[in-house]
């Protein structure tokens, strides 16, 4: 599950942190050293923590749990949308609306509105309206879709949240903490791991690194679902042995 080696992480640039002057001292245990005023993350720490996080995501998926993928900065959006969709998990890739979790009842109202508009567009209702009315409703639908398309099939709060860049997504992390929703997150050298349940110390800017984290999480979900769908169920779900992985 989530079969990633240290070489894969090196090639993706997972070990490159931020400039040393922007560091967060709480990340000191995960830093190997510095090179050209850039902190270098210790992949011997990252790899087992990454595997632990992926095993957790897999266990949740095996039990039918929902993991909300969150990454709204430009370098993360595409991978968040594609990998969450690939494994059938909800996602937020555009903008985190304040209250998306803590005020989920209101958000559900917006989701209902979006689904109503989509149904009207589909059944020809828009064609019976004036051009101005149809344009107004189309714009409303597009706006709602940008923000809510990834969570429109999420009927309740997620069981966990997988975050790329806890600094950029601090509001999402705060809401999850407030509701007791476990947070799995990539934490770079400029952020604090304090609010995160499953810390993955790593580069949160490089597209290749972001793709590695997200494809690993999607694979963990899909493999867990496949294992539990087979006769024998949960017994077939195999967690990754970090020691074996480090040999890669």
Curated annotation (Swiss-Prot):
Protein name (Swiss-Prot/TrEMBL): Small ribosomal subunit protein uS2
* Similarity annotation: Belongs to the universal ribosomal protein uS2 family.
Q: Which domain of life is it from?
A: Bacteria
Q: Which GO BP annotation is one of this protein's?
A: translation
Q: Which PANTHER family match?
A: 30S RIBOSOMAL PROTEIN S2 PROKARYOTIC AND ORGANELLAR, SMALL RIBOSOMAL SUBUNIT PROTEIN US2M
Q: Name one GO cellular component term.
A: cytosolic small ribosomal subunit
A GO term for molecular function: structural constituent of ribosome
Cystine bridges: none
PROSITE patterns given in the database record? RIBOSOMAL_S2_1 (PS00962), RIBOSOMAL_S2_2 (PS00963)
| Keywords carried by this UniProt record | Ribonucleoprotein, Ribosomal protein
